[in-house]
């Protein structure tokens, strides 16, 4: 395994390693490579956490879409009721 592959494996398993949910052999491998890749794993984790939180613009778009879809749903229900009453009488 080359250096990039080892780093990728370490980053993937880092959360499980911190929680102690790895098997003995994997835990030993992680302990051996912790000094090399721990900082990279923590930096990458902090970057992905920042990317996942929506910004103010995205929140306004989400709110707009919720209002839009709700209004379309209400229009559909009102149209269905109106057509039912119109055709029934």
Swiss-Prot record:
Key words, A-Z: Membrane, Transmembrane, Transmembrane helix
Segments traversing the membrane: 67-86
GO CC, any one term: membrane
Membrane topology: Single-pass membrane protein
Localization: Membrane
Chief location bin: membrane
Superkingdom of source: Bacteria
Descriptive protein name: Uncharacterized protein YlaB
Source organism: Bacillus subtilis (strain 168)
Lineage: Bacteria, Bacillati, Bacillota, Bacilli, Bacillales
């Amino acid at each position: 395994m080359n250096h990039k592959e080892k780093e990728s494996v370490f980053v993937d398993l880092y959360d499980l390693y911190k929680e102690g949910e790895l098997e003995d052999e994997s835990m030993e491998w992680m302990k051996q490579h912790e000094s090399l890749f721990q900082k990279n794993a923590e930096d990458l984790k902090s970057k992905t956490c920042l990317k996942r939180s929506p910004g103010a613009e995205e929140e306004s778009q989400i709110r707009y879409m919720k209002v839009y879809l709700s209004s379309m749903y209400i229009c559909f229900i009102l149209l269905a009721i109106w057509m039912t009453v119109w055709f029934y009488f």
